């Protein structure tokens, strides 16, 4: 295991002096160390026992971590002494599992086994459709929606509620046509039969029917008619059609 150590304890805090001390870490200079040289424990420039001294700049820590990343193999570990600058630089460089040992004042990070920029296929996979069971209470042989046949409409219900269209000619009064199919002819025949049955025979009881309405009783069948000869009224049978308006 090769360890690179640069002592910055006796160096002035000026950026120029730190940069010169950094350059003395020849093993981590650009091009001086082949990539993935170290298996583990690359200690970047810093104090004799660690990473970057208290006077190191954030830019210097970032460059050092970047070169340490290049020098490490996949899975290698970097150990450095420092504070927030060392931790942030290690994270930004790509190290994973960066932890801080507050007791020793050391920052430790691991170079992941995967390579940055690794390609992988985004080919979509076939979606598997899983059909869930209906449940323990489901039975394919049971039909819960049976229809009660007694609740169905019968032919009589359909005929009674069917709309009847009036196809007879309309004149002064609606009468059934010759080839009536709407039912008006049957209705008129039934009405005439009812009127014939309701005809009653009346005989004048008061004998004043011929004198006019002033002498007629309230139930006289001649109400509203002019006076006539008495001989025509006596014993005359009058047929009253209850279907007429009196």
Curated annotation (Swiss-Prot):
Decide whether keyword Magnesium is in the record: no
For this UniProt record, give its keywords in alphabetical order, as a comma-separated list. 2Fe-2S, 4Fe-4S, Cytoplasm, Iron, Iron-sulfur, Metal-binding, Mitochondrion
Q: Which GO MF terms does the UniProt record name? A: 2 iron, 2 sulfur cluster binding; 4 iron, 4 sulfur cluster binding; electron transfer activity; metal ion binding
Where does the protein principally reside? cytoplasm
Question: Carries keyword 4Fe-4S?
Answer: yes
User: What cofactors does the UniProt entry give for this protein?
Assistant: [2Fe-2S] cluster; [4Fe-4S] cluster
> Where does the protein end up?
Cytoplasm; Mitochondrion intermembrane space
Which InterPro entries does the record associate with it? Anamorsin (IPR007785), CIAPIN1 (IPR046408)
Positions that bind [2Fe-2S] cluster: 168, 177, 180, 182
List the residue ranges of the region (Linker): 125-158
Q: Which Gene Ontology terms of cellular component type are present? A: mitochondrial intermembrane space
Region feature Fe-S binding site A, mapped onto this chain: 168-182
**Biological process per Gene Ontology, one example term:** iron-sulfur cluster assembly
Q: Where is this motif: Cx2C motif 2?
A: 217-220
Q: Motif Cx2C motif 1 residues?
A: 206-209
Q: Quote the record's domain comment.
A: The C-terminal domain binds 2 Fe-S clusters but is otherwise mostly in an intrinsically disordered conformation. The N-terminal domain has structural similarity with S-adenosyl-L-methionine-dependent methyltransferases, but does not bind S-adenosyl-L-methionine. It is required for correct assembly of the 2 Fe-S clusters.
Family statement: Belongs to the anamorsin family.
The name this protein carries in UniProt is Anamorsin homolog
